[in-house]
Amino acid sequence: MQKSPLEKAGVLSKLFFSWTRPILRKGYRQRLELSDIYQIPSADSADNLSEKLEREWDRELASKKKPKLINALRRCFFWRFMFYGILLYLGEVTKAVQPLLLGRIIASYDPDNKVERSIAIYLGIGLCLLFVVRTLLLHPAIFGLHHIGMQMRIAMFSLIYKKTLKLSSRVLDKISIGQLISLLSNNLNKFDEGLALAHFVWISPLQVTLLMGLLWELLQASAFCGLAFLIVLALVQAGLGRMMMKYRDQRAGKINERLVITSEMIENIQSVKAYCWEEAMEKMIENLRQTELKLTRKAAYVRYFNSSAFFFSGFFVVFLSVLPYALTKGIILRKIFTTISFCIVLRMAVTRQFPWAVQTWYDSLGAINKIQDFLQKQEYKTLEYNLTTTEVVMDNVTAFWEEGFGELFEKAKQNNSDRKISNGDNNLFFSNFSLLGAPVLKDISFKIERGQLLAVAGSTGAGKTSLLMMIMGELEPSEGKIKHSGRISFCSQFSWIMPGTIKENIIFGVSYDEYRYKSVIKACQLEEDISKFTEKDNTVLGEGGITLSGGQRARISLARAVYKDADLYLLDSPFGYLDVLTEKEIFESCVCKLMANKTRILVTSKMEHLKKADKILILHEGSSYFYGTFSELQSLRPDFSSKLMGYDSFDQFSAERRNSILTETLRRFSLEGDASISWNDTRKQSFKQNGELGEKRKNSILNPVNSMRKFSIVPKTPLQMNGIEEDSDASIERRLSLVPDSEQGEAILPRSNMINTGPMLQGCRRQSVLNLMTHSVSQGPSIYRRTTTSARKMSLAPQTNLTEMDIYSRRLSQESGLEISEEINEEDLKECFIDDVDSIPTVTTWNTYLRYITVHRSLIFVLIWCIVIFLAEVAASLVVLWLFGNTAPQDKENSTKSGNSSYAVIITNTSSYYFFYIYVGVADTLLALGLFRGLPLVHTLITVSKILHHKMLHSVLQAPMSTLNTLKAGGILNRFSKDIAILDDLLPLTIFDFIQLLLIVVGAIAVVSVLQPYIFLATVPVIAAFILLRAYFLHTSQQLKQLESEGRSPIFTHLVTSLKGLWTLRAFGRQPYFETLFHKALNLHTANWFLYLSTLRWFQMRIEMIFVLFFIAVAFISILTTGEGEGRVGIILTLAMNIMSTLQWAVNSSIDVDSLMRSVSRVFKFIDMPTEETKSTKSIKPSSNCQLSKVMIIENQHVKKDDVWPSGGQMTVKGLTAKYIDSGNAILENISFSISPGQRVGLLGRTGSGKSTLLSAFLRLLNTEGEIQIDGVSWDSITLQQWRKAFGVIPQKVFIFSGTFRKNLDPYEQWSDQEIWKVADEVGLRSVIEQFPGKLDFVLVDGGYVLSHGHKQLMCLARSVLSKAKILLLDEPSAHLDPITYQIIRRTLKQAFADCTVILCEHRIEAMLECQRFLVIEENTVRQYESIQKLLSEKSLFRQAISSSDRAKLFPHRNSSKHKSRPQITALKEEAEEEVQGTRL
C-alpha cells in the first residue's frame, strides 16, 4: 500500500478533498489494484481504536452501576460527534434563510418599491454566498460523521472479536454462527452511513420551528394547514411502510423456499444431470418463484405509492398553506414564491429527515444493546492446575454442556429474588424449572501415570470429545475432580489449518527447534509431501488448507500438536483421513516411539490401538462401559471383545463403519445388561416422543444424527406441520434461523424462521458456533453451502466436505449509495464472501442497458408513455404560468384602485375563485398522472426480472459441467439471491426515481429557458460538466467499492477460521497473535472504505460546486436582464433552486442505477453460458407392453422397431478420453473395454486414479472424446437426456432435496403410489417411510437430516429401481453405511438388478468379491481388465489389497483339481432376515 497523501495535505486540500485526485486519475485510466490503495491514518488503526474503547468498556465494567456500552462510546466519540452536528445544523439553517432573501429579491421588482431595486444585486450575491457557505459546512460535516461511524464500527468489531475468543464453550453452543456474523455485519454497518442522519432528530424539530415562525409571519395561521398536511402525509407513509413490511415478511418465506431448492440444486448439479431432473427442478423452482413474485409486486406497488406521495405532495402543501390566506386577505407574488421555497425545506424535514433520524437512533441503540449483551456473556475460565504433578487423574466426574443443577438453582433463586417471590413460590418455581437434559459425561474415573497411553473408544455420541474438552478446561465439571499439570497439547478430530505457511502451522508460535521440527516432520510422514511443493515448508496455505488433501491436513494438525513440548497430549481421532498403511506407520513412529515418554490420551476405534494402549476407557452414552487394560477387557467383557475381534479386517474398515459397528455392539451389550430398558423403546424415533426435544441430552459436539436436533421457535415447526406436537418450552435463546436475526421485516432474504415459511423450510436446525467448531452439522441446510475451490471435485455426486463459508446465510447486498436500508434493512451476509473479480466492466456498458430494455417488448412503450405523460405535466405547468401572467396586470389595477394594499396584489377576492378553480383542476390532474404514470414501469420491470430469472435458471441447468466446474457454487447462488433480489426490489424503483428526477430537471430547465432564453446557454456547460464528472468518478468509485467488498471477506473468513480452531488457539495460547491478524484484516478494509468515502465526498462536493456556479449565473442573468415583472424573477430563481437540489439527487440516482445494473450484467453473463450438446432424434412408438415414460425408445440403425432400448445392458467403450474443463489436462486417456450384458465389473485404483471420473464420463458429465455404445447404440446418435436415462446411479453422496418422500422418489410424478410402495418394500424403505406422519407426503428438509445415511442410500436405490435402468453405476455406496443397511443394499442388488449390468467403484473387499471382472486404472488409463483369477495370480493392486482369509472365502477349493474355470462367487455370511428386519431402523 502507498503512503496516504492525506498526511501531507494542507487545510484547503482536506476541506475540498483534493488529496484524492491521484487515485481518481489512476482509477479513470487503469484498473486499480490493492497496492494502489493508500494506508490508513494512524488514528483509524484497529489497534488504537480498540484499545481506546476497551479501556472505557473496562471502566464501565469496573463501576458498580450496570455497565452501558453507550457510555463508553460517548466518552470516546461524543465531542467530535457534537462538533460535526453543529456544523450540520448551521448548514441546514442556511436553507431556511435562503427563501427570505428570495422574497426580498422578488419584492425589489415591485414598481412601488423601487428603493430596494438598487440592492437587488447585493441580495443576489448574499443568496449565492449562502449556497457557498452551505456547501463548505455540509460536506465536511457529513464526511466527519461518516468517519466517526467508521471508527465506532472498527472499535466494536475488535471488541466483539476479542470477546469471542474468550467465550465459554457453553455460550458458544447457544450462539448460532449466523447470529454472530449478523452482530458484526448487520448491526455495526448501521453506524457507517447512518450516523450522518442521527443529528436530524434534534435538527429537524428546530428547523421546523424556525420555518413555521417565518411562515407565520407570511401567512399567519393558515401556515399550519400545510404543516398539518405534511404530518398526515408522514403518518400515511409510515402506514404504507408497515404494509410494505407485512408483504416483505410474507415474501421472505417464499424467497427462502426458492433459495433452499436452488442451493440444493446448485450443490448437487451433477446428480440433477445424472438423474435427468433438469425439467423437474426448473418447474419446482419456477412455481415457487410465481408465488414470490405476487408478493413482490404488492410490496413494490406500496413502496411506489410511498415514493410518489413525496414527489407530488409539494402541490398540496403550497396549495393548503396559501389557499386560506388568499381567500381571506389576498396574496402577493413575493409571499407565494417565498412560501414555495419554505415548503420545499419543510417537506424534506418532516417527511424524510426526521423519520430517517428516528429510525437511525432506533436501529443504532438496538444494535448497541445487542452488542452490550454479547460483551457481558460468560467467558472461558482457565482452570487452576498443579504444575508439579506428573499423573492425570479424573475422579467421579460428571459434566453438562448445559448449565449444571447448581448453576440453574442459583439462577432460579436470583430470578425469584429479583421478582420478590416468596419462599413457597420459590420451591415451586424450582420444581418446575426445566433442567435441560442429561449429563454429557457421568461418573467418569481413571488414572494414568506419566508416559502412559490411554485409548478412549466408544459409541457415536458417547462423550469422547467432551472428555478431552473437560481435561482442557473447555467444559467445567459439575461434580468430581480433575488433576493434571496443565501443560497440554491438542489435536482436533477435524484438522484445522490457519492461513500461513506449512512451517508456521506446525510451529504455531512455539520457539523453533530444528532437530525437533525435522523429527516431527519425519514421524508424521510429511517429508515426501513437503518435498513435492516448490516452496517446500514455506508453501503458503490458503484458509482451511484447501490446497491440501484431507490426509495432509490431518498430518499437519498432528505435527502441530506433537511439536509443542507438553506434559499431556490429547489426540482426538487424528487418523480419520489417513489410509491404513500411513496410519499404522504414524501410530508406530509418532505416538508409540517419538512420544513414548509423554502422557497421551488417544481417541480411537481401532483394535490395534487398544491392544498397544496402557489403559483403555470405553464410553457409552456418557458413562464408563469399561476401564482397564486390554487383557482385562478380554477377561471381564469377553462377549464384547470377541464380537469386535470376530469381524474380519475390523481395522481395515472406514472410521465411520468402525464407529457404527462399535455403537451397535455397545448398545446391544449395554441393553442386555440393563433389564429395565426395553430394546424397542430405545429404537423409537425422537420425533415420536412428545417433548423429547426438551429432554434429550444436547450432545451437540457429537454426531448430528445422535445429537439433539435444534429447531427454531416458529408458529409451525416441521414436526407440528406433519401432525406431531413438539416441546414448547425451548429457550428463547435457542431461537435459530436460516439467516441471522433481524429486527425489521424488510429484508429481501428471510431474516429468521419466526416467519411461518410453509412446509419446505420449517424446523431448520441452527448452526451453533460449537457445532461449527466440531463439524457436527455437515448435512445442515444447503442454502448455506458454498464450495471454495475454483473447480468442484468431480464425482458422481458433488463433494460435501464443506468449509466455513457453507454455513453462511445470504442477505442482499448494498451495492450502491442508495438508501438500501429502506428496502433491505441490512447488509447481506454473503457480501462478506464476495464473488471472484470477474470480467464485468467497471462501468455498465450501453449494450447491457439495451438488452435490458428489449427483454420485454412492452418496456419500450412504457418508457415512451411515461415521457408523454411528463410532457402533459409540463404543458399543465405552462398553463399555470400563463394564468400568473394574465391575472397579474388585472389584479394590479384592481388593487391600485381600491387602495387596500401598498403591495402588488396578484389575487383578489374577485379573481381568486376563477384562478383557484383552474389551479385545483390542474393540480388534481398532475397528481393523478403523477401517481399512476410509474406503475406500468414498475410492473413491467418486475416482469423483466421474472424473465431473466427464468432464462438464467434454464441456462444453469443446461450448462455443461465443464463450464460449471469453473464457477463457485456460492457465486452461482449469489446470482439467484443477491442479483435477482436487486432486479426485483431495488432496480425498478431506482430506475423510476431516476427517470422521474431527470424529467423534473428537464422540465424545470425548459420552463426557465422559456422565461429567460439566456439561461439555457448556462445549462449547456453545466450538463456537459455533470456528464464528464460523473464518468470520471464512476470508473474509480466502482473499483473502490469492489475492493472494499473484497476487503470485507478476510474479516469474516478470519473470524470463522478462529472459531473453528478456537480450542486449538486456547490450548496453544495464540489469541494475541490472531487478534493482530484480525486487526490487519480490519485495517485493510478500512483503507478501502475510507478512500471510497473520501472520493465520494470529493464527487458530491464538486457536483454541488458546479450547481452553485450555475445558480450564480442564473441569479445574475435573471436580475440583470429581467425588467419589470417580479413574477418572472420569482419563478426563475425558485426553479433554479429546485434544479440545484433535484439534479444532484438525479446524479446520485444515476450512479445507483449504474451500480445496480452490474447485477443485470452478471445475470446476462450466466444467461449467455454455453449449453450441453443435445442432438435431436426421431422417436418411435413404444411397444404395447411398455410405456414411454418408463423406457426410452430410439430410432437407430442398430435398433429395430418395437425394441426396448437398452434391452441387455451390453456396453462397449472405445478410446474414451475425459477432461474436467476444455483447457484442462486429460483425467482419463484412451480407455477401451467392453462389458457383457448382466456382468458385474469392479473398478480398482488408488485414491485419485479416476474411478469416479470414469463413472461421470459414462454419463457425459465431462468433456469427453471417443465413443461408448450401449446395446449397439452410440452416444452420438441420441440426446443426452435419452443417454443418461439408460443408467441407474447410486452415488456416494446422496442428493435429498427439500420436498416430500414422493417428490424425492418420483419428481416427474410418473408412478402411482402403489408402484412407489412396491419399490419401497423391495429396498427395505417401506418401514422407514411409514413411521413418519403423512408417510409419502412427509416433507424432508435440510438434506433429509431426519434420515440416516443408510436410509438415504436406500432412497437412491429406490430411484434406480423405479428408473428401470439396465446399467447401474455405484460409486462407493457403502462408504458410510452400517452393516444392516449394507446387507439390505446387497440383497436388493441381487434381486432387483439381477439381470442388469453393474459397474461398481468400492473400497470394501467383500463387496468387490462379487464382481466377475475388474478394471484396474493407473496413471489415467486402463492398466488391466481381467477376471478375478487372473488378478489374483499376478502381482496386481487387487492381490495386494485382498487378505488371505478373503482369498480362502473366494476359493474354498482352490487346491482341488476339480475346480471350475469360472470363479465360485460366494456371498459373505449375512445376518438372518429376521434380524435384519428387527434392527433395520
Swiss-Prot record:
Q: Where is this region: Interaction with GORASP2?
A: 1387-1481
Q: Where is this region: Disordered?
A: 1449-1481
| Start and end residues of each stretch annotated as Disordered R region | 654-831
Recorded catalytic reaction(s): these are: ATP + H2O + closed Cl(-) channel = ADP + phosphate + open Cl(-) channel; chloride(in) = chloride(out); hydrogencarbonate(in) = hydrogencarbonate(out); ATP + H2O = ADP + phosphate + H(+)
Q: What is known of its domains?
A: Binds and hydrolyzes ATP via the two cytoplasmic ABC transporter nucleotide-binding domains. The two ATP-binding domains interact with each other, forming a head-to-tail dimer. Normal ATPase activity requires interaction between the two domains. The first ABC transporter nucleotide-binding domain has no ATPase activity by itself. The PDZ-binding motif mediates interactions with GOPC and with the SLC4A7, NHERF1/EBP50 complex.
Q: Which family does it belong to?
A: Belongs to the ABC transporter superfamily. ABCC family. CFTR transporter (TC 3.A.1.202) subfamily.
What protein name applies here?
Cystic fibrosis transmembrane conductance regulator
Q: What is the lineage of its organism?
A: Eukaryota, Metazoa, Chordata, Craniata, Vertebrata
